[in-house]
């Protein structure tokens, strides 16, 4: 199963992706994060998250 990180999940695009995600539940596992969960300006935190969750794809919806 492909692991996908979506940043900025509280914005308009992030919200729309959350609505679509269940359609892909059989092939993809989405990890939706907001600023409190993952500060994308903290490079080390981002790389740690990617590594610890085996993320294959990052979709940046953060403004």
Predicted regions and their residues:
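A short beta-strand-loop structural module common to alpha/beta enzyme folds
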Residues: 29-40
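Generic anion/oxyanion-binding catalytic loop in active/binding sites
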Residues: 2, 35, 47
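Conserved Rossmann-fold cofactor-binding substructure of NAD(P)-dependent oxidoreductases
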Residues: 38-59
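Short, high-confidence coil segments that cap the C-terminus of an alpha-helix
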Residues: 27-28, 55
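Conserved NAD(P)H cofactor-binding loop of Rossmann-fold oxidoreductase domains
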Residues: 61-63
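N-terminal Rossmann NAD(P)H-binding glycine-rich loop of SDR-like oxidoreductase domains
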Residues: 1-24
